[in-house]
A protein has these predicted regions:
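C-terminal catalytic and target-recognition region of SAM-dependent MTase-like enzymes
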Residues: 151-208
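Short glycine-dipeptide loop
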Residues: 142, 147-153
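Conserved SAM-binding loop of SAM-dependent methyltransferases across substrates and taxa
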Residues: 49-61
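Conserved class I S-adenosyl-L-methionine
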Residues: 37-48
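Conserved SAM-binding motif I beta-strand of class I
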Residues: 62-67
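Mobile active-site "lid"/loop adjacent to the S-adenosyl-L-methionine
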Residues: 70-72, 94, 98, 111-142
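S-adenosyl-L-methionine
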Residues: 69-115
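SAM-dependent Rossmann-like transferase core, predominantly class I methyltransferases
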Residues: 1-36
């Protein structure tokens, strides 16, 4: 992975997400083992530098990687090359995530797994405004329409205090109730070696 420190304290990877990568990676690999002739299709929205994309691809999924920043998608491709995964079936898309999902619905496309890692605030390539408290629930509603008849998982991450684990669980439980499955949510964090505590780094809501 290619790391680059930024003034806003990002380095290009969120290591606390490793537990989620292991979680959906296991689901994907088990599905591939059971039915190797049927691709597991995963949609990664707000995909950033590709940590989740590469974890899904390494597990055997066909991944659609969507981010509004052309430079960030180029960085994700560099990471795929550095990780030896550039030849995996990954579609690299520079687009506004909401508009991409709307088009995918019209095209009739479906996915077995969906990953969402939305920012608290952002702008699309054409100036589209994203505010997580206002925008994330309608996007979950749209994404539910993209799930296949036998979906595998849905993951949403939050780095804002306005979307706590219980809120994520509520949204997923409400919108995915048509599918049999279980919802859980949790805080994610990084272990601190000096004191044995865990540094909170956000929250995740998961359906499978």
């Amino acid at each position: 992975f290619n790391l680059k420190p930024f003034s806003f304290k990002h380095t290009g990877i969120f290591p606390e997400q490793a537990t989620n990568w292991d979680w959906f990676g296991h689901l994907i690999s088990e599905k591939v083992k059971k039915n190797p002739d049927k691709p597991v299709k995963v949609l990664n929205l707000f995909a950033y530098t590709g940590g989740a994309t590469l974890a899904a691809a390494a597990a055997g999924a066909h991944v659609t990687h969507v981010d509004a920043s052309k430079g960030i998608v180029a960085w994700a491709k560099e990471n795929a090359t550095s990780s030896g995964l550039i030849d995996k079936p990954i579609r690299w898309i520079v687009d506004d995530c909401v508009k991409f999902v709307q088009r995918e619905i019209r095209r009739g496309n479906h996915y077995d797994g969906i990953i969402m890692d939305p920012p608290s605030y952002g702008r699309g390539p054409k100036g589209e405004i994203w505010k997580i408290e206002e925008s994330v629930y309608p996007l979950i509603q749209l994404c539910a329409q993209l799930l296949s008849d036998d979906p595998l998982f849905f993951l949403i991450n939050s780095y804002t205090t306005g979307l706590q684990p219980a809120v994520l669980s509520y949204m997923l439980s409400t919108e995915l109730k048509a599918f049999d499955g279980q919802v859980d949510s949790q805080e994610v964090g990084l272990p601190v070696s000096s004191n044995g505590l865990v540094l909170p780094c956000g929250a995740s809501g998961r359906w499978s």
